[in-house]
Amino acid sequence: MDEAGTAAFRPGCTVSKIETDAATPVRALLQVSGLTKWYGDEIALADVAFDVNVREVLGVIGPNGAGKTTLLEAVAGLQPVDTGNITWRGAPLPRARRREFIFYLPDGIRPYQDQSVARVLAFFAGVYRRSGAHVAEIVAALGLGSVLAKRVHALSKGFNRRLLLALALIAPHPLVLMDEPFDGFDLRQSRAIGDLLRRIAQDGRALVLAIHQLGDAERVCDRFILLSGGRLRGQGTLTALRQRTGLPAASLEEVFLALT
């Protein structure tokens, strides 16, 4: 099966264990500190720091060009950075080992586009030793049954996004990074996908979602990091961000505008 898309999407990495100091309890699953990335003379990320906790949905919020995709790619190990540290449960996580723990779902790729949806799902299920019943449950949850025989290149944007979400569900990685997971869905579909993402987190995984639809973000995410011009402008729950801005009834959009 030929691969189309990005190296981040290449399956086959089993989830590993990384040595930690058992005497020191660590709540955060992933810790990012001092992450800085330059493109020539242009700053893409400036000293970005945040944590991701188990069973948490963290929203990365910002306009186009804010650095959201660059941040996800840097955390996933696809982008080298100039400075910064990433740890997993308190232990350093080298770039070469990120794929063992982190599944990155880019925006807009079409994986294995000359293959049928059914074959792509079966391939991923085989790689990660998932049962047919498990895959059938995912297919039903995402409404993919009607397109199983279609080739990936023939899928609409919405169905391609559903396929990508299905592959993220099949993969066992404890941390999933998603770039614009609601892109291509109408309001009803976005709500259903949001509910599904919440269930994924509640089942013990952590999600980091780069989102520009602030209504979806406000409904789905537990905490937020606000990016503008590659710089972290604020982070925390919506309640905490409201307190920081002195706007007790503000929406996420109003908080973002106040801080940027």
Predicted regions, residues:
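A short, surface-exposed alpha-helical micro-motif characterized by mixed small hydrophobic
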Residues: A217-R219
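Helix-to-loop junction immediately C-terminal to a conserved catalytic motif
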Residues: A76
